């Protein structure tokens, strides 16, 4: 089990757990992985998706925020980072999660708030750092931290191109 734990100003300790087996149905554990965020004053968020290495990927993902199902979608073939952003509908809000500078930098945003995240390393980070802007609250922070445990490389154009053959083969097998 890999986890990151640290203080978040005003919210206490927050923990990102990977893999979070408790969010994956027993019969799915061979093909799906899960990640979960918990904390003292933060709503629990969880995500499960098909495994890619040690992380769940966006394909066939299931997202839960504060005990409620949330919807996600993305446009994999858009040219711009903003166009390829993951769109999230959770707890009555609409978010976008996208890569910014490079594969170590991401941002979760909604009209009133933004949480910028940075990893010390793209693949196996020792440190995950975040900065909240605007009216960011515990739900925003929970989601931003959660997506740091999900394989999101295909939010970049190069990542989308690298993962394209696997996606096409997976669809051909359906």
Question: Predicted regions span which residues?
Answer:
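Short, surface-exposed coil-to-beta transition loops
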Residues: 58, 82-84, 102
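Phosphate/anion-contacting hairpin/loop surfaces
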Residues: 96-98
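Low-complexity or membrane-interfacial segments used for flexible interactions
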Residues: 1-29, 100-174
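A glycine-rich, hydrophobic loop/mini-helix early in the fold
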Residues: 27-73
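Long, distal/terminal scaffolding or interaction modules
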Residues: 79-83, 133-135
């Amino acid at each position: 089990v890999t986890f990151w734990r640290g203080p978040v100003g005003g919210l206490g300790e927050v923990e990102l757990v990977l893999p979070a087996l408790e969010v994956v149905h027993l019969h799915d554990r061979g093909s799906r992985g899960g990640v979960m965020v918990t904390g003292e004053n933060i709503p629990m968020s969880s995500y499960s998706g098909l495994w890619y290495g040690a992380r769940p990927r966006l394909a066939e993902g299931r997202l839960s925020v504060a005990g409620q199902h949330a919807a996600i979608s993305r446009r994999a073939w858009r040219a711009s980072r903003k166009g390829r952003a993951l769109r999230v509908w959770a707890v009555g809000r609409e978010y976008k999660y996208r890569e910014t500078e490079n594969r170590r930098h991401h941002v979760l945003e909604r009209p009133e708030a933004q949480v910028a995240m940075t990893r010390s390393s793209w693949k196996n980070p020792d440190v995950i750092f975040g900065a909240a802007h605007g009216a960011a609250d515990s739900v925003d922070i929970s989601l931003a931290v959660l997506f740091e445990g999900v394989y999101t490389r295909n939010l970049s154009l190069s990542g989308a191109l690298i993962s394209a053959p696997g996606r096409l083969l997976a669809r051909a097998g359906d």
